[in-house]
Swiss-Prot record:
It comes from Methanococcus maripaludis (strain C6 / ATCC BAA-1332). HAMAP family: RfcS (MF_01509). The lineage of its organism: Archaea, Methanobacteriati, Methanobacteriota, Methanomada group, Methanococci. Keywords: ATP-binding, DNA replication, Nucleotide-binding. Belongs to the activator 1 small subunits family. RfcS subfamily. Pfam families: AAA, RCF1-5-like_lid, Rep_fac_C. The gene is rfcS. Transmembrane segments: none annotated. This is Replication factor C small subunit. It comes from the Archaea.
C-alpha cells in the first residue's frame, strides 16, 4: 500500500527541510555541538515543526534516534497522568550509546491542561541533566510562562510561495506528474503556506489525473476559485441579493463547501474589493458576526444569506 506523500517525502535530515533557513541553521549548530536547551516550536499547522524535530533527532542520534527520542501528541494525551508516567519514565533513564541526553517531543503541547503543564515544568527541572524537551504548539500564549522561560523559542512562519512551488515540482517530477501553472497556483491558494496541506492536495489531485489542473485542485480541495467568490461578493455589494444567493447555493451544493470555508474565502477577498476602507471595516465585522453565529450552531445557509444581504446595504 502506498504511503501518504507527506510521509514518503518528509525530510530525513535538517539540510533537507524546506524553508526556515535561519531556524535550521541554529538547530544544525545544536547538532554539531551536541548541546541544546529545551525548545519551543510555535506556528500554524503544516509549516514544518514536527519535521524539524524529527530531523534534529535523526541528525543528533543517527541509528539510535528511535531509542533516544520519544514523540507524544499532547492533544490525545493531555492529562497529568501522561506527564507522571510516560514522560517521567522515559526522562529518568539514561541515553543509549554516546548520546549526551534524550529528547522528548510533545506535539500540540498547547493542548496540555494547566496541571499537566505544571507537572511538566517540574519534570523539565528534575531531569535536565539527561533529557531535553521540544514542545510544539499552534498558540504559544497557551503555554504557561514558567515553561516558556525555560525554552529557546522558534517561531515557524507559513512557508513562502517559492519554497512550496519548488517542493511541489520536485514531488511531481518524482511521481511523473504534469503540474500545470494553474494547478500550482491553485494549490498555493488553498494551502496558505501549509506544506502538509499542499502535498495532500497534490496527492489527491494526482489520484484523479496525471495532469494536475486548476479545476481538479479546487474540486478535490472543496474550494471555490477566487473569481467565483469575488463574483458572488460583487453581486451582493451591487444589491443583487437573489443572484448572489444563487451563487452561494451553487458553491455549497455543487462544490460541497462548508459555511466556514466560504467565510474564510470571502474574508481573504475583502482587501481586493473596490469599496471604501470604512465599508471594508463594516464587512469584516459582519463576517466575524456570521462566523460566531455559525460556530454557535446557527443554520449556515441562513447566516450566509444574511451576510450577503448586509453587503448590499453597507455604509
Amino acid at each position: 500500500m502506498q504511503k501518504p506523500w507527506v510521509e514518503k517525502y518528509r525530510p530525513e535530515t535538517l539540510p533537507e527541510v524546506v524553508g526556515h533557513h535561519e531556524i535550521i541553521k541554529r538547530l544544525t549548530n545544536y547538532v554539531e555541538k551536541k548541546s541544546m536547551p529545551h525548545l519551543l516550536f510555535s506556528g500554524s499547522p503544516g509549516v514544518g515543526k514536527t519535521t524539524a524535530a524529527l530531523a534534529l533527532a535523526k541528525d543528533l542520534y543517527g541509528d539510535t534516534w528511535r531509542e533516544n527520542f520519544l514523540e507524544l501528541n499532547s492533544s490525545d494525551e493531555r492529562g497529568i497522568d501522561v506527564i507522571r508516567t510516560k514522560v517521567k519514565d522515559f526522562a529518568r533513564t539514561k541515553p543509549i550509546g554516546d548520546a549526551p541526553f534524550k529528547v522528548i517531543f510533545l506535539d500540540e503541547s498547547d493542548a496540555l491542561t494547566s496541571d499537566a503543564q505544571n507537572a511538566l515544568r517540574r519534570t523539565m527541572e528534575k531531569y535536565s541533566d539527561i533529557c531535553r524537551f521540544i514542545l510544539s504548539c499552534n498558540y504559544p500564549s497557551k503555554i504557561i510562562p514558567p515553561i516558556q522561560s525555560r525554552c529557546a523559542i522558534f517561531r515557524f512562519s507559513p512557508l513562502k510561495t517559492e519554497d512550496l512551488v519548488e517542493n511541489l515540482k520536485d514531488i511531481s517530477e518524482k511521481e511523473t506528474l504534469t503540474l500545470e501553472k494553474g494547478g500550482i497556483d491553485a494549490i498555493i491558494y488553498v494551502s496558505e503556506g501549509d506544506m502538509r496541506k499542499a502535498i495532500n492536495v497534490l496527492q489527491t489531485a494526482a489520484a484523479v489525473s496525471d495532469t494536475v489542473t486548476e479545476e481538479i485542485v479546487y474540486k478535490v480541495a472543496s474550494k471555490a476559485r477566487p473569481d467565483e467568490i469575488k463574483k458572488m461578493t460583487q453581486l451582493a455589494l451591487n444589491g443583487k441579493f437573489v443572484e448572489a444567493r444563487e451563487q452561494l447555493y451553487n458553491l455549497m451544493i455543487d462544490w460541497g463547501m462548508s459555511g466556514e470555508d466560504i467565510l474564510i474565502q470571502v474574508f481573504r477577498e475583502v482587501p481586493n474589493l473596490d469599496i471604501s476602507e470604512k465599508e471594508k471595516v463594516h464587512l469584516v465585522e459582519a463576517i466575524g458576526e456570521c462566523d460566531f453565529r455559525i460556530v454557535e450552531g446557527s443554520n449556515e445557509r441562513i447566516q450566509l444569506s444574511a451576510l450577503l444581504a448586509k453587503m448590499g446595504i453597507l455604509e
